[in-house]
Amino acid sequence: MKKLIFLIIIIYPFSTHSLEKTKEEKVAKYIIQNIQKDYVTCYSFYKVGAEVFKKAKKNKEMIKSLEKSADITLKFNYDLGEVLNLKPKYMAQITKEEVEKFTKIAQNDFQSLAKKYGLMCKKLVENQKQRIDYWEEKGNEKIK
């Protein structure tokens, strides 16, 4: 968590309104954009997962844990969105659309969502550095 906040502080001067001059700055922006999208995805996964478990009257501790993870990912989604100069209204719309998409999938096959996003989202909440490293590697491959 501290590393993510440190990354945000370091990257802030390179937000979308700044000129991107170096590869490092471009990669840093790429990392923030993709991590922010990951947080939207994981918020949607946790939010929908909590609803699925509530409807199935599953373990209350599991529901509480999913809701807590949803809160964490939503906060970071908005924090990084601010760094990227995204408007709150735009972020709310994107988040709403992603939740709706996940809800439709979950109605037919929640297991596929859990399989695809469960581990990635768990790791994102518990250790953002791993995901930052992932996007840094991808950014270095993509940006020349």
Regions found by a protein language model. Give the residues of each.
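Short N-proximal segments of mature Sec-exported proteins
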Residues: 30-85
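Compact alpha-helical subdomains of small soluble proteins
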Residues: 65-144
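Sec/Tat signal peptide C-region and signal peptidase I cleavage site
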Residues: 14-20
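Generic short alpha-helical hydrophobic face used as a protein-protein interaction/packing hotspot
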Residues: 13, 46-47, 125
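Transition segments tied to proteolytic processing and entry into folded domains
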Residues: 29-30, 126
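Repeat-mediated protein-protein interaction surfaces in helical alpha-solenoids
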Residues: 20-27
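Sec-dependent N-terminal signal peptides
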Residues: 3-14
